């Protein structure tokens, strides 16, 4: 383990997952800063413009930190990782005894491994690359985990086709299955997936998304859709989303035009899922906001949404800058971007 570590802050398309008081990060795309400013078409980034990351580290959220100062609570775990450089993978806390991180698929460049599942035991600090049964084609996707069953759900298109699939991975038996596609939306990527307590996965945004919000029920393997009321958010690709205890899905960032990655102007919108009909609203933010971004990560710790890295296409940050931002979500009528994280003490 390496303390006093600073991760590459220009990364995007990385993964993040919370376990206890640690936010784990892995992978992503790192631009070549000397020539990136000359790239005009962002929809397909050639290898000479960017490389894939093999960093693996965590942010310790058991201690306070400030975003306008050097963050000293990063811990580097790259020395124990066996994963090749990668980006755009599915990554969840979803394993035996709730102590295992599971990663599947993504973009490995020209070095795609035969077995696409990697697991990290946070107790023994060991990575494994197990052989699984019924492995699907490689996909770029988001995942959600049902902690009661230990199953990961990944709805996506394959890397080389437009065919939709609902892939279900049982982390206990290391077995793959498929979910129903009856009533499913078209295959998509660059969306967010949020599992509600009632068993519905809410899919928001993404390329080829339009109309009502798709819902997949993990309890009975069925698709439905929800027509929403309230504010009409700008359609967007690759935002982030977090779920609060009172049923708010907070959606941040995203792009409008994939070829240019133009940022959305309403970069913080909220979907209230508590009623029989979901309601959108544009968040009221009473503080200055960071530059809108996409391809970032967002993790909810207590009532703080911690946003890390990503792209805004206005500039590449200096390597000395923190690219971590904190949104206080405690007041649903008044959201605040703040510069200090203070762990909430349990009573």
Give residue spans per PLM region.
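Kelch-like beta-propeller repeat domains
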Residues: 1-347
């Amino acid at each position: 383990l390496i303390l006093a570590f600073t991760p590459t802050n220009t990364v995007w398309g990385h993964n993040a997952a919370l376990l206890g008081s640690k936010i784990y990060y892995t992978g992503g795309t790192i631009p070549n800063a000397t020539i990136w400013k000359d790239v005009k078409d962002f929809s397909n980034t050639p290898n000479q413009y960017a490389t894939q990351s093999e960093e693996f580290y965590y942010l310790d959220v058991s201690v306070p930190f400030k975003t306008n100062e050097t963050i000293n609570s990063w811990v580097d775990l790259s020395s124990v990782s066996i994963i090749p450089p990668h980006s755009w993978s599915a990554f969840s806390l979803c394993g035996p005894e709730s102590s295992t991180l599971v990663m599947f698929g993504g973009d490995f460049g020209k070095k795609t491994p035969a077995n696409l599942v990697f697991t990290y035991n946070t107790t023994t600090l060991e990575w494994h690359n197990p052989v699984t049964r019924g492995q699907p084609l490689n996909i770029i996707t988001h995942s959600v985990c049902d902690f009661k069953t230990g199953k990961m759900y990944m709805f996506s298109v394959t890397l080389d086709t437009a065919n939709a699939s609902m892939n279900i991975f049982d982390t206990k038996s290391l077995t793959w299955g498929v979910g129903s596609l009856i009533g499913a939306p078209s295959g998509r990527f660059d969306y967010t997936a949020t599992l509600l307590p009632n068993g519905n996965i809410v899919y928001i945004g993404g390329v080829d998304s339009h109309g009502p919000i798709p819902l997949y029920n993990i309890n009975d393997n069925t698709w439905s859709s929800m027509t929403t009321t309230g504010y009409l958010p700008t359609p967007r690709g690759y935002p982030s989303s977090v779920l609060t205890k009172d049923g708010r899905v907070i959606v941040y960032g995203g792009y409008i035009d994939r070829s240019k990655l133009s940022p959305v102007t309403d970069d913080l919108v909220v979907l209230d899922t508590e009623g029989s009909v979901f309601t959108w609203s544009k968040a009221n933010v009473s503080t200055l906001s960071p530059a809108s971004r996409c391809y970032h990560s967002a993790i909810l710790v207590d009532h703080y949404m911690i946003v890390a890295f990503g792209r805004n296409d206005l500039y590449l940050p200096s390597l000395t800058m923190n690219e971590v931002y904190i949104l206080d979500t405690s007041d649903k009528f008044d959201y605040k971007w703040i510069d200090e994280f203070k762990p909430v003490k349990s009573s």
